[in-house]
């Protein structure tokens, strides 16, 4: 069960978050069997839905944030969707987590280093620590940091101070893990911890 929530911050601002529950549904009532987990630790995956009667559990989200959707520079249209993601459950100790794998990722060209624009993907193996950063052509920047306990994404822009952002997620894999980064223009989708931690961030 996934829920799109509006959470009130201490500052009075709203935070838009998706979380999910693992449990049993008998056709009328859902019974959660464990605590809720965050679906996406970035800011640009909201109101995601799955498809009834599909052969697999496929998730598709709105790749924007109500916090700044009207401030992001745009022409002709203002709205994008995430890649479709195949969902499976994986148990880590006594908790079940959703593993998210982008559908059709093979069609994206593979690069060794991030590009400032265009469509590309990277596949990365990491262990205790990892760091990666790049900029778009208009100066928007993103930095990815991984340490023993956290996966952290920082977004910056030299002119747009409102674009500053820090997202943090807990590490779930002990030891070596894998990560896919998929870029489509200014939309970055990060699938870390073997797909157990996702972050969707729009650069602007």
Residue ranges of model-derived segments:
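Internal metal/ion-chelating core segments
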Residues: 1-34
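Beta-rich accessory regions
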Residues: 24-204
């Amino acid at each position: 069960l996934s829920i799109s929530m509006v959470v009130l911050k201490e500052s009075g601002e709203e935070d838009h978050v998706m979380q999910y529950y693992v449990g049993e549904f008998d056709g009328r009532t859902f019974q959660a069997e464990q605590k809720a987990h965050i679906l996406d630790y970035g800011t640009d995956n909201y109101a995601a839905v799955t498809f009834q009667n599909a052969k697999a559990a496929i998730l598709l989200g709105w790749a924007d944030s109500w916090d700044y959707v009207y401030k992001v520079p745009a022409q002709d249209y203002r709205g994008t969707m995430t890649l479709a993601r195949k969902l499976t459950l994986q148990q880590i100790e006594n908790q079940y987590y959703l593993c998210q794998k982008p559908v059709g990722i093979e069609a994206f060209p593979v690069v060794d280093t991030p590009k400032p624009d265009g469509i590309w993907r990277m596949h990365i193996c990491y262990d205790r620590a990892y760091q990666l950063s790049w900029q778009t052509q208009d100066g928007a920047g993103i930095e990815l940091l991984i340490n023993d306990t956290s996966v952290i994404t920082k977004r910056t822009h030299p002119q747009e101070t409102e674009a500053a952002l820090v997202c943090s997620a807990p590490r779930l894999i002990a030891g070596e893990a894998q990560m896919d980064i998929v870029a489509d223009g200014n939309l970055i989708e990060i699938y870390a911890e073997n797909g157990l931690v996702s972050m969707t961030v729009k650069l602007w």
